[in-house]
């Protein structure tokens, strides 16, 4: 196999394992790929999404820090053109902010998420399910829900 063929084979296997709900096999494959290449974009993407999904399913305590770190590693490995990376990191930051009661700490997380979600919107304006609600919450939390940007999103998407 050439490096390109290996990447294609890895991608196909990931899709097959994911579609077949073979989580253990997928995680094992991703672990092996990251052991070979810690900056492998596709492996990091699967890892970040897997961590975020697990945190979302937690009912007692949701610790978003591992998902945030995974998405930050993915962002480092990206070329900056993938909206889902910016949206995923922005979503995780917003979800963490939603669990914090100290307003200043909460606002800081929304401020960190804001440019990420704006970038996701700019890169993929048609995929509003990935960024619109969270961007609306950021505008409302950082500025005001009466801010023209928040109002525009609310009117456009019906929040």
For every predicted segment, state its role:
Residues 12-15, 46, 84, 88, ...:
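Canonical tetratricopeptide repeat
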Residues 19-21, 48-61, 90, 95-105, ...:
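Short coil/turn linking the two alpha-helices of tandem helical-hairpin repeats
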Residues 2-5, 38-39, 72, 76-81, ...:
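Short coil turns that delineate tetratricopeptide repeat
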Residues 111, 115, 119-159:
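Terminal, low-structured helical/coil segments at or just beyond the last alpha-helical repeat
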Residues 1, 32-33, 73-74, 120, ...:
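Canonical positions in the second alpha-helix
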